[in-house]
Amino acid sequence: DVGEKISEFSSQLVELAQDQLESWDFDAPGVDVLEWAFNYLSENKLIDTKQTETGFPKNRLIDDGEGRKMVYLSGTTCKDVNLILRNGDIIAELREEVQFGEYDVTILGKSRKRNMSHDLLQYINSSILIVNNYEDQKFDKILLPLDYKDGMLKVAKYAVRVAIALNVGIDIFTVLEKNKSSNKGSAYFSKIVKFIRRSGVQYSHEEKEGNIVEQIIKKADENKIIVMKASDMSPIKRFLKGSIPLSVMNKCDVPILIVK
């Protein structure tokens, strides 16, 4: 709907009102979250101290025209730290951001909503690290559930990178269904173990019989990080049978890296 053109006097009033609003320094929705993130990074010395002297740089908040607002920072443990703000549905926006940035890993806090956890695993096209109750724990092992199926070598590579970063060992853990034989001597398993051994990371391997989810949860403790493969079932099968990574995530309170 287009109304009549306003008078010159009215136009001046509108401009005056806009100038007044700008002088009040209102923040766009969500900017306070970026400021909180900036303060957290600053307090933990994760960004260059030269960029923290004057506080959160609102004047450097950039709108890229793609529905994203950003602040570019220099990190201390990595080269770049970008604070990115999107508004909208969390699943849709995360999915778009992962596709836009081509991220390898998305790090998220554990959601209390089961449906949201399911959607995050299903629709975000990257590996996902779910951080549960993290408060500067000292992790002593990586728990690597191994099922002898294709795709486990990539999971092992992620496990090794995390183990090296934290200077810890890896517990390889295999759960066998009742009355099923082990594939421990298979060429594929040997390849995975050889890769881990050559990395210099200390490791052990244990096999147990029983329910996969129950055994993984029993094996995990508060000082371990689980690194496991994402479910390769179709969405319909996951809905009917349930996803092992999702079940472990919902019942465990340790960080879980789900590798896709």
Per-region residue spans from a language model:
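Short active-site-adjacent structural elements
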Residues: 181, 214-216, 234-238
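A structural preference for short, hydrophobic beta-strand core positions in alpha/beta folds
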Residues: 50-52, 82-85, 130, 172, ...
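Short glycine/serine/threonine/alanine-rich loop segments
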Residues: 46, 126, 168, 201, ...
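Small/aliphatic-rich secondary-structure junction motif
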Residues: 1-27, 49, 141-206, 219, ...
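Gly/Ser-rich helix-loop-strand patches that form or flank binding pockets
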Residues: 83-137, 220-260
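Aromatic/hydrophobic pocket-lining residues that form π-stacking "cages" and hydrophobic walls in ligand
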Residues: 37, 94, 159, 192, ...
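Charged docking surfaces used in two-component/phosphorelay signaling
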Residues: 52-68, 72, 76, 81-93, ...
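N-terminal positively charged helical leader segments and presequences
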Residues: 26-50, 62
